[in-house]
Amino acid sequence: MALLKVAPSRLLSRALQLASRVQNCTPTVTTARRNFHFTVYGRKDTSAKVSDSISTQYPVVDHEFDAVVVGAGGAGLRAAFGLSEAGFNTACITKLFPTRSHTVAAQGGINAALGNMEDDDWRWHFYDTVKGSDWLGDQDAIHYMTEQAPASVIELENYGMPFSRTEQGKIYQRAFGGQSLKYGKGGQAHRCCCVADRTGHSLLHTLYGRSLRYDTSYFVEYFALDLLMENGECRGVIALCMEDGSIHRFRAKNTVIATGGYGRTFFSCTSAHTSTGDGTAMVTRAGLPCQDLEFVQFHPTGIYGAGCLITEGCRGEGGILINSEGERFMERYAPVAKDLASRDVVSRSMTIEIREGRGCGKDKDHVYLQLHHLPPSQLASRLPGISETAMIFAGVDVTKEPIPVLPTVHYNMGGIPTNYKGQVITHVNGEDRVVPGLYSCGEAASASVHGANRLGANSLLDLVVFGRACALSIAESCKPGEAVPSIKENAGEESVANLDKLRYANGSTRTSEIRINMQKTMQNHAAVFRTGSVLKEGCEKLSVINSSMDDIKTFDRGIVWNTDLVETLELQNLMLCALQTINGAEARKESRGAHAREDYKVRIDEYDFSKPLQGQQKKSFNEHWRKHTLSYVDKKGKVSLEYRPVIDTTLNEDCASVPPAIRSY
């Protein structure tokens, strides 16, 4: 703790000690307060050295790796140990201990056409995912993900993931929303593999356990600040060690961003407080685009008043949504799928019920999820976590009474634009171009397999398929031990200057005050239903709130475990995500998937698919909205938008593309 009061020269001495520790560390490294049972700095990182080129106020340590992964959730772990398994000297930087990552909160399951409950085909899964995306998903990436799904689940089983089982010993698969057989003509599919209702917890711990087999260098509780970019190429990451305030520059030939979503831009969400869009913001500050951030998924069943997630698996097991009249109202909105329609459809239906006065409770501002008609033994075996969560956060015994629920922000379909190999792309002169050295996967990325709306249980699949894809792509294009490109001597100095600016910020507005203003603006102006006037007002309000960042006040001037500073850095990241989200929503004058405009209620494609195509003239690219939004933010907070086409072709003839059609359940 002496670092709080020592002079800059003493800090440099501390940095020398850090570098010495890096060069001489053993498999177990003793830090100031704990023993980690895996290497923190890594045995191979003998090239780490002290630099004073960007700061004399902070210890600065330079590292060199073949690859750096930012984030240690499901996608980050799968990418990291995939790279280490292929022989790459790999670092994994994470602001959380790996098993604290938000993947742990996923409940329902992971989709794969295993066919354990009835005959199934990955092509039917492909069709459902394209339809679920409201035809904004890129079909080459969806083809890749759904075809890889069965092998990915079997791989997890081989890693030791304890899937729920049928009486015959096969992996149990439950029904989930938007899933069908025979291209929508064969009834409800049972495609969701699960570990009761704790699938994300099991997945994360399984991947973490597997990762310990490999010699990955984990830098735990390091906050990634920015990408190190040179001439349009990514050459690594600069990060803050939260434990001692040292700065670390990770120079690498390949960088993978797997930092998760930005759910905390909204006031009510199912996301952890750490879901702050760090990677998305890093890409934005690097001058690269983000894609489709206006598409924010509202999960139909967050606990009323608490926002905690109640898995879609409840409805997959037979749970139903009812209004104040006791009516199973989804039968009116989705006559075939009913309570297992896609999430955007169910969330809008619930909102309409509440608006029209059929909500529950004294304020009629929520609906009920009924489970007590199901056998208690089924609830105990298939939904044990939900039974516990409902009792803790709603005071409800699910065997006797319904759970009060409300649509709650849950997932970000948009993110960092990538191709199906995980390579980050930009769109220049009508063509997609790869950003050399930069990859992304998981919720941080937009491949785009989810398009305008994600199907439940496709997110965990996304993590493992594209985490692995990033590792495979790097292994295809690079070899372990290749020369790592150099960086400028002053690379990262802007990041350190920003860190110092926030650490000593002495304005009049607390970080928490600006954050709550941003979150409530997003909640009130970019919710389930949106209108142009409300979105425009939200854009103007958010611009003012962003300007108030210049008047921010922090209180902790130290560098050791400065949570005030870290929360302010996270607020900067959230603000960049929020600006792009609401401006993209205001500009998109149609309704598609999770983006529902009350002043533009129809989906605007190249053709009107509600009518015969014969005789219709195809709309030009500028006239229709079946295209991806690319958003940029300049240093003053001004958002600019561009657009790129949706990819309608599949990878090969094994799977036919699905042409746009009316989307109904």
Swiss-Prot record:
An example Gene Ontology CC term for this record: respiratory chain complex II (succinate dehydrogenase)
Listed Pfam families: FAD_binding_2, Succ_DH_flav_C
Top class in the EC scheme: oxidoreductase
Catalytic residue positions: R343 (proton acceptor)
UniProt KW keywords: Electron transport, FAD, Flavoprotein, Membrane, Mitochondrion, Mitochondrion inner membrane, Oxidoreductase, Transit peptide, Transport, Tricarboxylic acid cycle
Functional description taken from the UniProt entry: Flavoprotein (FP) subunit of succinate dehydrogenase (SDH) that is involved in complex II of the mitochondrial electron transport chain and is responsible for transferring electrons from succinate to ubiquinone (coenzyme Q). SDH also oxidizes malate to the non-canonical enol form of oxaloacetate, enol-oxaloacetate. Enol-oxaloacetate, which is a potent inhibitor of the succinate dehydrogenase activity, is further isomerized into keto-oxaloacetate.
Similarity field: Belongs to the FAD-dependent oxidoreductase 2 family. FRD/SDH subfamily.
Protein name as annotated: Succinate dehydrogenase [ubiquinone] flavoprotein subunit A, mitochondrial
Organism: Xenopus laevis (African clawed frog)
